[in-house]
Amino acid sequence: MTFTGSFLRGCMVCSCALSLGVMPVVAASPAADSAAVQKLAHSLKARVGMAAVMLDTGEAVAVGDETAYPMQSVFKFVLALSVLKRVDQGALNLEQIIHIRPEQLVKDTWSPLRERFPQGGDFSLKELLRVTVQESDNNTCDLLFALIGGTETVQKDLKEWGISGINVRFTEDEMLRNHELQYANSSRPSAMNALLRAFDEGKILNKDTQRLLWDMMAGCATGTTRLKGKLPQDYVVAHKTGSGFTVITAVNDVGIIVLPNGRKMAVSVFVMDSKDSAPACEKVIASMARWLCTEWQAAAAK
């Protein structure tokens, strides 16, 4: 079956309209807060979705959250949760060795592991997970999908965790072969924050695997000019980025920001179909994160 961009975008909007709310909002954001976020979002010639929530109070602010956005590599965070769930269950072992053959390393895709080991080799599950999360390797991503039974497994996990508004339908290789499929791998910003919150509260993983994934995300090597771009070094950012193909279909960053006082904020920013450059999109993401951390009333309350 051939999917068109308009069809997939339409599916996203319908799915979004039918999905139930996933983030309880304790207090509505002041109008000034919403206006400030909208001003940043409207500075780009793009569709921008941003949602932030203080994890201790539930106070939230959002713009463009009625739309589902293509995740691109952000979905590797969701995949990592599914893999580590099976580690917790004993079905997988972080130290188990996985043999990768040369023909499994697709050439025309982002793959730091292939660049280092073009002939493949033997790797621990832990290392493949690290390369997938921290370096956003597309080949190791698809190997992990195959290991747990495909994208359907991840979608079932999301349902089990009570998360609606996130869709994981296609692998990296499938999106590479048909770029329009990226629109089916979608998320609303607040839905991603719901997943980040469940992860942080220990509702998905055991303590050891939760800490492992947190450390991997805190050491993310991609997108350093996005959420982290304008924050001082005393802010910890555990995050996962996502980027589109040759056209600026997606410039994303999602994660948890730990403020110097120890408070935590889940933030998800998705930029879709931008007519501006990737650096311009990244600058806006960085500005949003800085505003949230330094000027948003909910963050400054304690």
Region locations from a protein language model:
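Structured C-terminal helix/loop/strand segments within mature extracytoplasmic catalytic/sensor domains
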Residues: 29-40, 146-147, 151, 194-225, ...
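Short, well-structured active-site flanking segments
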Residues: 85-105, 151-156, 206-210
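Mid-domain, small-residue-enriched loop/turn segments at the edges of structured enzyme/sensor domains
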Residues: 121, 142-201
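Conserved catalytic neighborhood of penicillin-recognizing serine enzymes
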Residues: 105-142, 151
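Beta-lactamase-like hydrolase cores
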Residues: 25-70
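Bacterial N-terminal signal peptides
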Residues: 10-22
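Active-site SXXK
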Residues: 58, 70-100, 132, 267
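Soluble periplasmic/extracytoplasmic beta-strand elements of cell-envelope proteins
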Residues: 49-54, 61-62, 78, 99, ...
